[in-house]
């Protein structure tokens, strides 16, 4: 963890013990924590961590996936399939990434975007970025 890092934790229910441990650790280290949850699911979920806490007990801000509870897209016979929260949270992550890049550009800075290896000159561009972010890119 780097002191400059902001953490985003994604969970439909926000009650899993390992997730709570990670949220607790982030806050103990003084990091800003943003939770991405499905509020309808979160509100009905019982805490599973021994502390009785859930993700929003640690989050500085949260984003709501706004999917239904239960989190299903289709009824196939007796089965419920196609969880929407996975798709919605992925789209939200891409939108957040795009907005961060937009903020870089609108503030006159070069956005640190790694290019596909298929793009001509990507190796030179990407090496410059990995040099700048040495030790932070995995």
Placement of each model-derived feature along the sequence:
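Glycine-rich phosphate-binding loops that contact phosphosugars or nucleotide phosphates
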Residues: 1-98
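Active-site phosphate/pyrophosphate-binding segments
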Residues: 102-138
């Amino acid at each position: 963890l780097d002191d400059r890092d902001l953490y985003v934790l994604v969970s439909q229910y926000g009650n899993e013990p390992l997730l709570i441990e990670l949220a607790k650790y982030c806050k103990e280290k003084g990091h800003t924590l943003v939770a991405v949850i499905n509020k309808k699911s979160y509100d009905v979920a019982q805490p599973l961590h021994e502390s009785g806490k859930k993700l929003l007990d640690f989050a500085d801000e949260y984003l709501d996936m706004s999917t239904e509870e239960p989190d299903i897209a289709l009824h196939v016979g007796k089965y419920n399939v196609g969880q929407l929260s996975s798709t919605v949270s992925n789209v939200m992550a891409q939108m957040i990434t795009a907005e961060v890049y937009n903020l870089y550009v609108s503030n006159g800075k070069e956005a640190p975007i790694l290019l596909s290896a298929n793009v001509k000159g990507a190796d030179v561009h990407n090496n410059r970025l990995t040099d700048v972010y040495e030790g932070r890119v995995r």
